[in-house]
UniProtKB/Swiss-Prot annotation:
It comes from the Bacteria. Pathway: Isoprenoid biosynthesis; isopentenyl diphosphate biosynthesis via DXP pathway; isopentenyl diphosphate from 1-deoxy-D-xylulose 5-phosphate: step 2/6; Isoprenoid biosynthesis; isopentenyl diphosphate biosynthesis via DXP pathway; isopentenyl diphosphate from 1-deoxy-D-xylulose 5-phosphate: step 4/6. 4-CDP-2-C-methyl-D-erythritol 2-phosphate binds at residues 236-238, 262-263, 284-286, 360-363, 367, 370. PANTHER family: 2-C-METHYL-D-ERYTHRITOL 2,4-CYCLODIPHOSPHATE SYNTHASE, CHLOROPLASTIC. Gene3D superfamilies: 2-C-methyl-D-erythritol 2,4-cyclodiphosphate synthase, Spore Coat Polysaccharide Biosynthesis Protein SpsA, Chain A. Its cofactor is a divalent metal cation. Its EC number is 2.7.7.60, 4.6.1.12. Residues 230-390 are annotated as: 2-C-methyl-D-erythritol 2,4-cyclodiphosphate synthase. This is Bifunctional enzyme IspD/IspF. It catalyses: 2-C-methyl-D-erythritol 4-phosphate + CTP + H(+) = 4-CDP-2-C-methyl-D-erythritol + diphosphate; 4-CDP-2-C-methyl-D-erythritol 2-phosphate = 2-C-methyl-D-erythritol 2,4-cyclic diphosphate + CMP.
Length: 390
């Protein structure tokens, strides 16, 4: 279940808490892996918020044949019902319902839950309550101490025979009962027997921002993390021809000549497009925009760079830095650097301190030294989800 908004944990640039990074990996990706790694698990329905499809693709870029995406509803209870309905054609014998923000579910607990399932009873992992419990009045004053005997804190995944728990959810939906706090409560309401087994202290739910911080710290302490940071390089060159300006990084700069090319010949953006594509092993600019294709005749090169950035982001990549070096005797780049930097910021959606634009001459050597054209070298650094594989 991953359709919640996570108000208590707060929002971040990564989205709701199930998409926050812990140990360089999204919470939901880690949770999902526990189930995809379990040979006892068949089809997995991941229920997400209708607005979160792009977030999910970024968090879980790899494809799993046994994973289906389901759009959730306005409440957890309704999202669970929709997830169960998505499995109706398969009609599994049993189903496990798990919180997407419990990323530390272990294989041992999964196996014990499944081993205790029968056609006659569900299974609820839980921990015996160890804290002293108090009942308070409306004014906050203690009324009484509650005995801990027989009290348990419920965890997930909660497991049930599929048909009875789906029927229970459908009955609750039909009469608009929305007050159940978990699936075991719905099972109790419909008199489905539920067996409690010992849960795991590690199987905590990430509810607050502090929980996410602690989970991230825990993972980083448990093992060395090698984040998937990739660097791509690009190089391009264009010759001069008669004209009155050149376009560099999307900025028109007055000059006694223009650059010759099929598009607008923006040598800087062409090199940077190749650099971004290189971080995904996605070919080069000619692969995506062949110069033989007439539709790109005179095209603005920002189309190319924005296309490359989209490919990066669809794979969950975050552009950490771009660096462009222009090699030219003229025109002078310095007076236009700020405008060029801002143009790249706008195209890539990154801050100015992540953009570097430099220029150098070729000391009057070669075609650049003879003022026959301009060359550009670009480097892009992109951080992708997950770690570098061993």
């Amino acid at each position: 279940m991953a359709a919640g908004r996570g108000e208590r944990a707060g929002q971040s640039a990564e989205g709701p808490k199930q998409y926050r990074l812990i140990g360089a990996e999204a919470v939901l990706a880690r949770t999902l892996r526990a189930f995809t790694d379990c040979p006892l698990i068949g089809t997995i329905a991941v229920v997400i918020h209708p607005d979160d499809h792009a977030l999910y693709r970024r968090a879980v870029p790899e494809k799993h044949e046994n994973v289906i995406l389901v759009t959730g509803g306005p409440t957890r209870q309704e999202s669970t019902r929709l997830g169960l309905l998505a499995l109706k054609d398969e009609a599994p014998q049993y189903v496990l319902i798990h919180d997407g923000v419990r990323p530390f579910i272990g294989q041992d607990l999964l196996e014990r839950i499944i081993a205790n399932l029968t056609p006659d009873n569900g299974v609820l992992p839980a921990l015996a309550v160890s804290d002293t419990l108090k009942r308070a009045a409306a004014d906050g004053m203690v009324e009484t101490t509650i005995s801990r005997t027989g009290l348990f804190a419920a965890q997930t995944p909660q497991a049930f025979p599929y048909a009875p728990i789906l029927d229970a959810h459908e009955k609750a939906f039909a009469i608009n009962r929305t007050d159940f706090t978990d699936d075991a409560a719905i099972a109790e309401w419909q008199e489905i027997a539920v067996r409690i087994i010992e849960g795991s202290a590690d199987n905590t739910k990430l509810t607050w921002a502090k929980d996410i911080e602690m989970a991230d710290k825990r993972l980083r302490q448990d093992h060395a993390v090698f984040p998937d940071i990739r660097t791509g390089n690009g190089y391009d060159v264009h010759s001069f021809e008669p004209g009155d300006h050149v376009t560099l990084c999307g900025v028109k700069i007055p000059h006694e000549a223009k650059l010759n090319g099929h598009s607008d010949a923006d040598v800087a953006l062409h090199a940077l497009t190749d650099a971004l594509l290189a971080t995904r092993g996605a070919g080069d600019i000619g692969t995506h925009f062949p110069p033989s294709d007439p539709q790109w005749k005179g095209a603005a090169s920002r189309i190319f760079i924005e296309h490359a950035a989209k490919i990066v982001r669809e794979a969950g990549g975050r552009i950490a830095n771009v660096d462009v070096t222009l090699i030219s005797e003229a025109p002078k780049i310095g007076p236009h650097r700020a405008a060029m930097t801002q143009a790249l910021c706008d195209m890539l959606g990154i801050a100015a301190d992540r953009v570097s634009i430099k220029a150098t001459t070729n000391e009057k050597l070669g075609f650049v030294g003879r003022r026959e054209g301009i060359a550009a070298i670009a480097t892009a650094t992109v951080i992708y989800p997950g770690e570098v594989p061993e």
